[in-house]
Amino acid sequence: MENSMTLPKIKQVRAWFTGGATAEKGAGGGDYHDQGANHWIDDHIATPMSKYRDYEQSRQSFGINVLGTLIVEVEAENGQTGFAVSTAGEMGCFIVEKHLNRFIEGKCVSDIKLIHDQMLNATLYYSGSGGLVMNTISCVDLALWDLFGKVVGLPVYKLLGGAVRDEIQFYATGARPDLAKEMGFIGGKMPTHWGPHDGDAGIRKDAAMVADMREKCGEDFWLMLDCWMSQDVNYATKLAHACAPYNLKWIEECLPPQQYEGYRELKRNAPAGMMVTSGEHHGTLQSFRTLSETGIDIMQPDVGWCGGLTTLVEIAAIAKSRGQLVVPHGSSVYSHHAVITFTNTPFSEFLMTSPDCSTMRPQFDPILLNEPVPVNGRIHKSVLDKPGFGVELNRDCNLKRPYSH
């Protein structure tokens, strides 16, 4: 362990990508939508593009997997390295190597907040309210936390102040909540398959899916719907009421990110006891403050897209101040180390990436080595007791470094 007064400086930052439109298809990794054929995650799931028949059957048909995985590695002067992955691919590599590098190299490995603030402010003129640029900044931020943990010999969750519970319990996102129940998860979240362009028939079909799973899973197992920005307020409200008899726990991301008034109206008109949730495609701290003010029940930032761990901690504080939960969108170890320190995250999400949801596959497979998966729906804090985020980069993947500096 390094003496706290002599922490090393960062020598270099490097960026690779794998998968996406300019590399091999089905690479998986940080871009978990980049899967092969016959995978549940690409099977007639409702999206904002579903209203166009040419793009209704497959999300890959409209390009959901064009970005690919971004891998950022930071190296300290003592030779230690930290890394992280997200969804930004080749374009993220350009941003890291040609712009953000100047804010990283030469800084102390503990200067995470300074680097974060400089990256955010230096990209304001082209980052908008999130998206590719924020994904890239998030990836750098996570890599910095990984490096800091490895330098001082501590897991990231201890750098954040330590665990507030002994284990994390998970619900599973996938097409088969009935299988998730058998694996020990506390609930199952299904994608919707129909949208406003399908009219009331679409509502009946998705409600029938919920009814079928309720019968298979029993009364107490949580069931939720992920609507992936595909609806309008009227349709979402009608769908929520159609699913109420089957004890739907929450309805998620019905509307596009900026429709704050719509979320306020949906929460106001949703069935009593049914939660309204959103947040995975919100990309700034300010957007989460506004989202929080709509009164939704759970905010769901993705730590690889919202600004990184540094921003996620701030979002959790906003939610806590309003009595709201923060349950991050997937993100594996990058979420695990955060949520085990949050008092307002009583459970977390595990995204099923096996094609038929029948086996436990790590979310970012194959890019991470030693990536933990829940056992009987849980991960004990002792599993996280490794320096940094506790995973290593699989350098046998087809990594490409298109830029340097």
Swiss-Prot record:
Cross-referenced Pfam families, in alphabetical order?
MR_MLE_C, MR_MLE_N
Gene3D superfamilies in the record: Enolase-like C-terminal domain, Enolase-like, N-terminal domain
Query: What does UniProt list as catalytic?
Result: 329
Q: What is its EC number?
A: 4.2.1.90
Q: Which UniProt keywords apply?
A: Lyase, Magnesium, Metal-binding
Please name the SMART domains in this protein's record.
MR_MLE (SM00922)
GO molecular-function annotation terms?
A: L-rhamnonate dehydratase activity; magnesium ion binding
Q: Which residues bind Mg(2+)?
A: 226, 252, 280
Provide the GO biological process annotations.
amino acid catabolic process; carbohydrate catabolic process
Family matches, as PROSITE patterns:
MR_MLE_1
Q: Where is this site: Transition state stabilizer?
A: 349
Superkingdom of origin organism: Bacteria
Q: Which positions does the site annotation Increases basicity of active site His cover?
A: 302
Any other noteworthy remark? Reaction proceeds via a syn dehydration.
Q: How does it assemble?
A: Homooctamer; tetramer of dimers.
Described by its record, this protein's role is as follows:
Catalyzes the dehydration of L-rhamnonate to 2-keto-3-deoxy-L-rhamnonate (KDR).
Q: What is this protein called?
A: L-rhamnonate dehydratase
Q: Which gene encodes it?
A: rhmD
